[in-house]
């Protein structure tokens, strides 16, 4: 009886590990989508109103910040990047670090071009992650 209970416990831990790993892989894609949406929102605000970044973020929808894993919905780009860092690979993290560092500096046209560059770069990375997602999900399920 104890052997059966032990076997069931080991099996349930494996299933739980696989479930958590698959959710993590899907969350990686969701976080990238959240950052793309946030940069699109910031770009639109810069294009229409040319507000400072703090004013843009204070007027943003909380769902934008939640998608980027913002701690307690703080409209603070460095804090959001730090909170979402666990879900970002090296390229995406480097791209977003550059975005956080460069946004708000320069003229309107320059900021719009930089936003377009970061959106394009993140979309390319998102496509790469989305293409690898089924393989990574199968790998997580197989290993666990």
Model features per residue range: what roles?
Residues 2-71:
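Juxtamembrane/interface alpha-helical elements of multi-pass membrane proteins
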Residues 6-20, 24, 31-35, 74, ...:
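A generic structural signal for ordered alpha-helices
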Residues 35, 45-109, 113-119:
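Glycine- and small-hydrophobic-enriched helix-loop-helix hairpins
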Residues 104-144:
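Membrane-interface, cytosolic juxtamembrane amphipathic helix immediately N-terminal to a transmembrane helix
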């Amino acid at each position: 009886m104890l052997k059966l209970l032990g076997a069931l416990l080991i099996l349930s831990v494996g299933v739980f590990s696989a479930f958590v790993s698959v959710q993590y892989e899907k969350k990686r894609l969701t976080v990238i989508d959240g950052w793309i949406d946030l940069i699109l929102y910031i770009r639109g605000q810069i294009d229409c109103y040319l507000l400072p970044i703090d004013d843009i973020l204070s007027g943003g929808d909380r769902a934008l910040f939640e998608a980027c894993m913002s701690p307690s919905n703080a409209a603070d780009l460095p804090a959001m990047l730090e909170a979402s860092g666990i879900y970002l690979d090296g390229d995406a993290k480097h791209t977003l670090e550059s975005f956080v560092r460069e946004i708000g500096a320069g003229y309107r046209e320059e900021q719009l071009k930089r936003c377009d560059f970061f959106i394009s770069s993140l979309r390319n990375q998102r496509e790469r992650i989305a293409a690898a997602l089924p393989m990574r999900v199968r790998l997580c399920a197989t290993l666990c």
